[in-house]
Amino acid sequence: MHYSTISGVSDNEKLELFLVLLLNFYVTISPISKIGLFIERKENGMAETRKLYYENGACLQFCATVLSCVPTDGNFAVTLDATAFYPEGGGQPADRGALGGARVLDVHEKDGVVVHTVTAPLHVGEVVQGDVDGRRRLDHMQQHTGEHIVSGIVHAQFGYDNVGFHIGAQDVTVDFSGPLTDAELADVERAANWVIWQNAPVTIAWPAPSELAQLNYRSKKELTGAIRIVTVANVDVCACCGTHVERCGQVGSIKLTSAQSYKGGTRVTMLCGDRKSTRLNSSHITRSRMPSSA
């Protein structure tokens, strides 16, 4: 029923009556239906989630208001007005942790809205605390910044582009657009660790379109709109949506573990930070027999 079809009252009275009926319908339908209406409005242009992980990559604990909660495959899809949970994207996996006492199993983004898959329902309108798994976040930051260091060096020395990047559970793979010999990769590794020892700063910026047009940056130049630029001082300038450490020293160290020809270029497997220390140190432990006493 449209309010214009109501007879015997003025147009203003028709509109007021229609709004009362609509409000009465909304407050009497089931909570799940309310959520459905809310999500439909959200997907049709409501405000994007405030992304705390962009404001401060070290933010691991926060409070936010629950905007929606929908059952999905035995779990619940939750949206908030703000979040520090990084959603999967740009080759980087999603954060894990806890939200309002529920475990966060996955995080993804759609049309600027970050959706958290959690193990228990949360109440719409409730303010909840989020706790991001700090060890996992730091690991991803180390791997991602390490990749930028290596990719920046390869681009500067050989002119190759990074055409593929993935942080896996065990290894990081980077695909370059040209061939690289073992000797060249050894030089790249040494140069990358030198950058780490120099503790070069890593900065984030959102340049205005006029500034961006003058900026010589690597990767994703086809993107439009607000572009996030990650700069490793004197090494790399790249458009990127991932989380990063503040200084290269926090990467710890880099090891290029293998390389293979791939689609006319080179796929490099690498380890950074704690992954490198744990994996390589554990595989090179030797035991010395204690001398027997006389």
What role is predicted for each listed range?
Residues 15-17:
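Cationic, low-complexity basic patches in intrinsically disordered or flexible, solvent-exposed regions
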